Amino acid sequence: MKKVMLVFGTRPEAIKMAPLVKEFQKQPKRVETVVCVTGQHREMLDQVLKIFDIKPDYDLNIMRQGQDLYDVTARVLVGMRDVLREATPDVVLVHGDTTTSTAAALAAFYQQIPVGHIEAGLRTHNIYSPWPEEMNRQVTGRIATYNFAPTRLSKQNLMREDVSPDSILVTGNTVIDALRQVVRKIKTDAELDKELEGVLLRSGYDVNRLVEGKRLVLITGHRRENFGDGFIHMCTAIKDLTRKYPEVDFVYPMHLNPNVRKPIHEVFGEDLSHLENMFFIEPLEYLSFVYLMEKSTIVLTDSGGIQEEAPGLGKPVLVMRDTTERPEALAAGTVKLVGTDYDKIVSEVSALLDDTAYYDAMSKAVNPYGDGLACGRIVEFLNRKE
């Protein structure tokens, strides 16, 4: 029997790895599935584990107040050393571009354990954008024995780096697997739908406002490279858009990071509770976020995963970054880059709200990130490696 260890530590990783954990667990006679979490995003991670009913076998619980990337890397590396010695997995699977992924892959390499990289081959070719994610994924890619690329372009990126084609499998993105499972769950469970409506209300937004065609712009922002002036420009643009479109609701679930919240208060003031059509709400669990995203008109974000998820729901995405490691979405027309440029943010949101044809061209474009069957392909591939 093969022992497979899946390691993740942030909410986005957990969302994309959860359906893979469940897929492996369907084959208990062939695979022993071991889950190790680092707790890099403690509270947000635990929410996802609960939604997908995943109980970790190991929890490094690395988070400490005021820690930096040095601390995170060191704690994951040392913690994984001990976990790998005890668990002795045949293969370690990591996801994407987080510090957890890179440090866990390095720890496995030090013990000569093969590494499988989920969401391999994404590249901006600029190690400082996004930072530190671009370097993280390049380092993880150098360590990986198996590379599970979400798209053909990702595979081409790897082959240009002299990665053997035999080690690469194009799978689609596991986030679409997760998204489809969750949307199906919400739409077929009236009690859950009502519960999520209540969650949103307690968080600060009443979805019953969305009647008679009222539109919603959903906003997320948390990237390190946007801290400082970038966030000020983003928030100023959003503030002016709320004034330009008083009939449209703007909802921003705020990340817990103080570097995100500080510029929001600088632009919008200390009291965020009495703004006309701008709603700053607390961070949402994955189920609640998907529920709100499904009801949105436009998504304005600096997130990576949302560039894949939102188009799966037919939502145009404006990306508040200067580069993206998801050029397939740009080529397909499901996303557009606006950076943190005030004028671009205002003009593109305005165009989508004012021009139906422009909106339809983005919302009806085909999502290039797969069919929801990525996890099955990964499990089948690794089973053949016995």
What are the functions of these language-model segments?
Residues 1-252, 258-386:
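Nucleotide-activated sugar donor-binding and catalytic core shared by glycosyltransferases
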